[in-house]
Amino acid sequence: MAISAPAACSSSSRILCSYSSPSPSLCPAISTSGKLKTLTLSSSFLPSYSLTTTSASQSTRRSFTVRAARGKFERKKPHVNIGTIGHVDHGKTTLTAALTMALASIGSSVAKKYDEIDAAPEERARGITINTATVEYETENRHYAHVDCPGHADYVKNMITGAAQMDGAILVVSGADGPMPQTKEHILLAKQVGVPDMVVFLNKEDQVDDAELLELVELEVRELLSSYEFNGDDIPIISGSALLAVETLTENPKVKRGDNKWVDKIYELMDAVDDYIPIPQRQTELPFLLAVEDVFSITGRGTVATGRVERGTVKVGETVDLVGLRETRSYTVTGVEMFQKILDEALAGDNVGLLLRGIQKADIQRGMVLAKPGSITPHTKFEAIIYVLKKEEGGRHSPFFAGYRPQFYMRTTDVTGKVTKIMNDKDEESKMVMPGDRVKIVVELIVPVACEQGMRFAIREGGKTVGAGVIGTILE
């Protein structure tokens, strides 16, 4: 799904490059020129020009020369993925509409009506169908992709599968009602899946007559956030009315900052998001990792491992660790190729073949990973949060119990694992898991796999997906 920043960029950029359309209407889909470097050698780009040993910066210039000269790729803003979370009917979708309409009034967004966002298209991630609506908009400093899910189950599935990764969230709480059960569940889920920061919007301020009541709700929200180990004391909380902002902007789409109290609250919220939610570290800056998809031998040259670079960069001559399934070993990269073209280095997002010195084809297999030495280790036991599909979603028809042994699909590997323990949100042991449940489990794999905290996986049984999860804690 094209919401996580690298994917969002690459798919949009790919359209532009392969068709070379002069239409300016396509250009806003590019997230940030600062990230184009990551995409330069992405698989769809290469056939469009011959590339032998160009550096990343040269090829960026070459592939985008014409457009840059016409000012189409001048977007220098960093890209951030955010989403609205919170209890049903507290105003998440109305707020999303208000954000797009307010920023459209200053030319930084395309206004979306409530029903355009609410009729969310279906997406699939790890074999699970999820309804998510994505809108994009800009502030003065940043470009945002914003995800909104219509149903509570869609939030749970989206956050666990990572279909729409969030770099931060806007927690929407009704000022008239205060925090409700799903408010708590979404905060907990955000913590468990690693959403680093959030900003709060106290909605429906117009329905609260007493200012003290609003202060009490704010206090309650701060305490709740602190109880889930967010920085409750410092998180910005902005109160307002998304509905009144939408009504004002519907009557007059050209309302400017300072013209209307409720529209100003929306700008104030985005100022807080700009200031408080940090720009995430991009994939190229992280330690190198490639999950091996295929292996073949080139007579006289050695063994080639192919796959997509998940993060970081790798250059010819560098040493990499081969991790997972067997004992970890180190090898030297003697060549980097993509589509029969030789490269100096591979970047995050590239589909490449790495030529390795001193390794036989039999020593490497699909499911292993090549990584920067020491950056990732193999493990056999971890604790994870999982969502189990309902029967209607194509999942199991019956519950499962401790001792259940499905297949766990992680990156390019599938390995059998045993569910040794089942727990609820309070870490109390449970006896069984029903289809549709979200629970914490402890898994023991039959062979060590390169895994890490925050890594997502699918659970499969008999050829079909029965659940998805994210690793919370590595145990051994």
From Swiss-Prot:
Any single Pfam family the record assigns to this protein: GTP_EFTU
Name of protein: Elongation factor Tu, chloroplastic
GO molecular function: GTP binding; GTPase activity; mRNA binding; translation elongation factor activity
Transit peptide (first-last residue): 1-67
Keywords: Chloroplast, Elongation factor, GTP-binding, Nucleotide-binding, Phosphoprotein, Plastid, Protein biosynthesis, Transit peptide
Gene that specifies this protein: TUFA
Organism: Arabidopsis thaliana
Subcellular location per the Swiss-Prot or TrEMBL entry: Plastid, Chloroplast
GO annotation, cellular component aspect: apoplast; chloroplast; chloroplast envelope; chloroplast nucleoid; chloroplast stroma; chloroplast thylakoid; chloroplast thylakoid membrane; nucleolus
The tr-type G domain, residue ranges: 77-281
GO BP terms, alphabetized: chloroplast organization; leaf development
